[in-house]
Amino acid sequence: MCNEPATSDVALPDLDWAKGDGLLPVIVQDADTLRVLMLGYMNSQALEVTQRSRLVTFYSRSKQRLWTKGERSGHVLHLVAIDADCDADTLLVQARPRGPTCHLGRTSCFPAAPGQFLGALDALVAERERERPQDSYTTALFEQGVRRIAQKVGEEGVETALAGVVQADDALLDESADLLYHLIVLLRARGLSLADAVTVLEARHR
């Protein structure tokens, strides 16, 4: 099964509102790519509105009022899940953004960390699997079925191994990128995600 974030809420009385004078910092994360999108603040009313409307709403410290992200631009954040940290004084919000989150037109208010593109690629492959746009190589792979996709993974694996032995670094990187892409497609064709494979790696590491 694909690792879909579970919708969850937090209970207001369980949170430590006193530490921040009635405000809690809120880290917003893309529910699909897991990229951190922004930091905001919520009071209890903002949290209630967020849970009720399913649109992420903050408390503006400068304007001294509630504001729903994207209320003017339309670039709202659709709530998927809310969790508190171990001290109950910080919230992690998983959301699906409609458009860029940053007011500068960027996906995130923070620069992308190396490796984060894999999450975005996994989400894009999932979108291709759902929507099947024409003239898409990914769509063509899905329509050929699991056997063909698995065959491509095998071919790319062999080419990557050969590049690692007898070719230059650029060739090895190119083949590695092809292998990763086709592996993500294979996982999606089986109803799985890259996150599922990462979960297995994490379990082995413990």
Curated annotation (Swiss-Prot):
Q: Name one Pfam family in it.
A: PRA-PH
Q: Which gene encodes it?
A: hisI
Q: Which residue ranges does the record annotate as region Phosphoribosyl-AMP cyclohydrolase?
A: 1-117
GO terms (molecular function) for this protein are: ATP binding; phosphoribosyl-AMP cyclohydrolase activity; phosphoribosyl-ATP diphosphatase activity
Q: What is its EC number?
A: 3.5.4.19, 3.6.1.31
Q: What's the superkingdom here? A: Bacteria
Question: Where the protein is mainly located, per its record?
Answer: cytoplasm
Kindly list the places in or outside the cell where this protein is found, as annotated in its UniProt entry.
Answer: Cytoplasm
Name the PANTHER family for this protein: HISTIDINE BIOSYNTHESIS BIFUNCTIONAL PROTEIN, HISTIDINE BIOSYNTHESIS BIFUNCTIONAL PROTEIN HISIE
GO biological process annotation, one example: L-histidine biosynthetic process
**What segment(s) does the record annotate as region Phosphoribosyl-ATP pyrophosphohydrolase?**
118-206
Q: Name one GO cellular component term.
A: cytoplasm
Quote the pathway field: Amino-acid biosynthesis; L-histidine biosynthesis; L-histidine from 5-phospho-alpha-D-ribose 1-diphosphate: step 2/9; Amino-acid biosynthesis; L-histidine biosynthesis; L-histidine from 5-phospho-alpha-D-ribose 1-diphosphate: step 3/9
Family statement:
In the N-terminal section; belongs to the PRA-CH family. In the C-terminal section; belongs to the PRA-PH family.
Q: Which reaction does it catalyse?
A: 1-(5-phospho-beta-D-ribosyl)-ATP + H2O = 1-(5-phospho-beta-D-ribosyl)-5'-AMP + diphosphate + H(+); 1-(5-phospho-beta-D-ribosyl)-5'-AMP + H2O = 1-(5-phospho-beta-D-ribosyl)-5-[(5-phospho-beta-D-ribosylamino)methylideneamino]imidazole-4-carboxamide
Annotated protein name in UniProt:
Histidine biosynthesis bifunctional protein HisIE
Q: Which UniProt keywords apply?
A: Amino-acid biosynthesis, ATP-binding, Cytoplasm, Histidine biosynthesis, Hydrolase, Multifunctional enzyme, Nucleotide-binding
